[in-house]
Amino acid sequence: MSRFGRAVIVAGAMMLAGATSEPRVVIVLDDPRAQLFRPDEAWGLAIDGAQRGEVDQLLTPANLAAIQRSGLRPLTYRLRTELGIEAWHWNPAGTWSDAARAQGYWTSNDTLGLPIQLSWGYKLPRRGDTVDNANDTDFSRLTDGDRTTFWKSNPYLDASFLKDGQAHPQWLIVKLDQPRAIDAARIDWAEPYATAFEVQYWTGADEDDDGGRWQAFPHGTITSGSGGRPLLRLAEAPVKTQFLRVLMTAGSHTMMPGAAGDDWRDRAGFAVNEVGFGTVRADGSLADVVHHAASHTAQTWTHVSSTDPWHRAVDRDADLEQPGIDRVFDSKLGNGLPVMMPTGMLFDTPENAAAELRYIAARGFPVKQIELGEEPDGQYGDPADYAALYVAFARRLKGIVPGAVFGGPSLQQGDSDTWMLPNAPGSWNGQFIAALKRQGALRELGFMSFEYYPIEDLCGDIHTKLLRQSRTLGEIADRFAAEGVPRSIPWIITEYGFSAYAGRAESELPSGLLAAEINVRWIALGGSAAYMFGIAPAEPDNQHAACAGYGALSLYRSDSAGQAAEPMPSLAAAQLLTRALTVPGHDLHWMLPGRVEGQGKTAPGGTLKSWAVARPDGKLGVLLLNRSATQSVTLPILVQARGGTAMVANGPGEIWTYGAAQYQWRSAGPESRPSRSVPPAHALLPAGPVRVTLPPDGMVVVVIRR
């Protein structure tokens, strides 16, 4: 007898592997690869920041009831402000470091008052990035043509704060419109300025050239800088390049004009008003090839290593709102379970983060996991800088919420790579883990988190891309292990979806297949949890290319008022997992890998996938996916003990089926919508051998005694 109980078989109807050419599913009941999980911890939902007015539109009683019908119970709160280079005023009430002028470094109020319903991000006026990963409406102050504005690096990366014994040089990168001849630079320094810095050019053919290196110009190394606005003659002969970098290693620690009081943060880091590059004219002036404009579409592109979280009351971004903390917990979206909460980090202060956690603790909200920042790899900063901030924040915040652990880094993608950092080449996450180890701080990483949107191109053969992503999740797990992520901590997909872009495939049957597979495969690989992104009912959109059509990543297609209307395949996938495959609730289940044999010509390319769940009620749940767009498949389910003989499973039982008979998407541009949308079909299986028919693009769950 296996640890999961005795399999029910059909006496005399034994089917040996290889005895027939038809496909068949084989479940090994005591497979050593089985993974323990609890449904109310493993499969959840993600709520994020939104555009103006969308939080109110989402959190209505009708929408909340519709979302909870998914059966996905735990919740993670996503922090869009971290993608938009904004500081999060998690409580609109709070204090400024320069209160008289309503500016400086913000700390939200941690005293209890009226419930917080909405919160906002605040743009950072000392920004040095031309683009961001959120609304992307702001611009870099390095090439905006205004000498009264400036970029400043994050003072919390200064040695005066970190005291970690590590060098954290800061940098700015300029990407010209095309390769240009460069022999001079004008760096218009603000306060504090760099006393030691190096002006460099990129030797690679392009930014993705693995052989590229940052090379100092012949006269580009400055060891006794004194600020000002000097014209630097970098070389006797111009160097042709498209990418330039100013690497700053020592600062003046001088106070900027107009600073209030004697705040150490005003002395820490580096500040630059404007940069220009080009060649020296005969009259000694600079023929500047940089485009200076206060617009992210018109200025020369720049990117920086970090940003000062200093801002003003007038910088509130009314178009980027976050759900209020109280509102999230009061909504019951988390079903009373612990919610994974974030704090700002890359663009925030530890003081504000600490106040947030004190507020959560005072309210008694259930929180066990706290994610520090979001998508730092997508900001293309130095992973060693992120690691230093991570450790500093984690140690500062530890113990405020009793029993809570800190984690991250919420990678933009599992296969994160560094960008133009030849001193730290390869895996961004690998460099992050290595930096934690150098500090003796790997124990501060309480869980590993990343986001997963595997289909980048929504045009072409979607089904081939589905097959490819099956391998991708396994490759990510292998990569984490190779990077040194401890297996003793939870590995969590804190957001997943079909694609980061909206298009037709997100609303067609393959979207349900992918959602189901991500959830079960991640658990089967030893992952701890996966959270679905896209809980807000949505209207179809196209964010990719004309060939991608219109669709939405959502549980429901919305009506014109943003309320849940027609169910989408992602809802069916969630319900099949939470209400059919498993027993709802907190009881322990075992995830078993299923083996599909004999696919051959009947199912070319491995289009059939299967997993099984040993349930606490003594039953066996089996999930089958058919990722063929055209072929239906009928096959038996076999069970065996390890080393034993595979035998055909026997009914009675239950079966749920979801395919084209239940759902079809009608493409009509922005007016696209389901032409058919009904729940998965449910039927009872009679006694006798279990044979299952999978429709094209179909999901099937079978539950039998084991």
Go through the PLM ranges and name each one:
Residues 644-695:
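Acidic, Ser/Thr/Pro-rich beta/coil linker or hinge segments at domain junctions
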Residues 89-178, 190-193, 278-287, 295:
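Disordered, acidic Ser/Thr/Pro-rich linker "stalks" and the adjacent N-terminal cap
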Residues 350, 356, 383-521, 525:
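Noncatalytic carbohydrate-binding groove/subsite architecture in carbohydrate-active enzymes
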Residues 601-651, 655-660, 697-703:
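Carbohydrate-binding surface patches
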Residues 168, 191-282:
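Trp- and acidic/polar-enriched beta-sheet ligand-binding modules for extracellular glycan
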Residues 32-123, 276-325, 333-348, 352-355, ...:
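N-terminal substrate-binding region of glycoside hydrolase catalytic domains
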Residues 167-169, 177-184, 240-242, 617-619, ...:
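Extended extracellular/luminal ectodomain segments enriched in beta-structured repeat modules
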Residues 493, 497-608, 616:
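Aromatic/acidic polysaccharide-binding cleft in carbohydrate-active enzymes
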